[in-house]
Amino acid sequence: YIDGDKGILLYRGYPIDQLAEKGDFLESCYLLLYGELPTQQEKNDFDRCIMQHTMVHEQFSRFFHGFRRDSHPMAVMVACLGAMSAFYHDSIDITDPHQRMIASVRLISKVPTLAAMAYKYSIGQAFVYPRNDLSYAANFLRMCFAVPCEEYKINPVLARAMDQIFILHADHEQNASTSTVRLAGSSGANPFACIAAGVACLWGPAHGGANEACLKMLQEIGSIKRIPEFIARAKDKNDPFRLMGFGHRVYKNYDPRAKIMQKTCHEVLKELNIQDDPLLDIAIELEKIALSDEYFIEKKLYPNVDFYSGITLKALGFPTE
């Protein structure tokens, strides 16, 4: 549920800030799937079910070799998700509620593995197998950044930040990618094909690609000295330049996800003690100026979730593309 005028986002009746601060991503998954929060035993069982299905078919490793190393990861993910229907024939009947739930569990558990494999392939590193004893977010970070020659140490602050990014993006009512999934599903297409269609929609710069577009804008600004120039351009109605990462089509007030992500972003930057990244310096200064500028305050152009998530993901080590 979304109330854009009041800046409210609820998952099954629960405020997003409560879920992000007190729970974890798999708890939000359970809530969205079953309509209510789990008991401790239900949570333990659900976590175990997800984490015991994180492996993907070994033939997937060969599947990746059909792509160029510089392929956009979203192109790879669309292909991989569609290909899941070729490996898991027992969960492709979209009319069967039991098969739909099995497909949901497989998608939640295996998509991080495939995403990490896509990243590793793009940089020429060995795939890292999942570990069932780690949390969902910690496991994903390890699969992305661990290397065979040394032990990967989980940083709890970074793992928590990744988990919150997952929670904040778990649901947003009838957005473009959700609409695409439902449209594909209305034809009777299998769940994996439907999700692949949704990911293809998410690729668009006006949707999931917004945080990438925000980082590219920061690269275009180039230095802190040029921020006033770009602020002036953003105010000029005759200039096609748009300040990415500010304002929201749905939220006429502050994006409730942005409040949470702002705190998380600053925690990550503090934890990593990042002081020599010009892009992050520009982002922090741009945030300060925009939050104190009367033009942005009057028009309620506050930094949105894409602004902070893009900066956070970059700080975590994910390349812009």
UniProtKB/Swiss-Prot annotation:
EC category: transferase
InterPro entries (alphabetical): Citrate_synth-like_lrg_a-sub, Citrate_synth-like_sm_a-sub, Citrate_synthase, Citrate_synthase_AS, Citrate_synthase_bac-typ, Citrate_synthase_sf, Citrate_synthase_typ-I
Pathway(s) served: Carbohydrate metabolism; tricarboxylic acid cycle; isocitrate from oxaloacetate: step 1/2
Reaction equations catalysed: oxaloacetate + acetyl-CoA + H2O = citrate + CoA + H(+)
Keyword Repeat annotated: no
Protein's UniProt name: Citrate synthase
MF-aspect GO terms: citrate (Si)-synthase activity
EC number: 2.3.3.16
Gene3D superfamilies reported in the protein's UniProt record: Citrate Synthase, domain 1 (1.10.580.10), Cytochrome P450-Terp, domain 2 (1.10.230.10)
Keyword Transferase set for record: yes
Biological processes per GO annotation: tricarboxylic acid cycle
Keywords carried by this UniProt record: Transferase, Tricarboxylic acid cycle
Active site per database record: H248, D306
Species for this entry: Bartonella elizabethae
Pfam families in the cross-refs: Citrate_synt
Homology family: Belongs to the citrate synthase family.
Additional facts recorded: Citrate synthase is found in nearly all cells capable of oxidative metabolism.
Cellular component terms (Gene Ontology): cytoplasm
Top-rank lineage group of the source organism: Bacteria
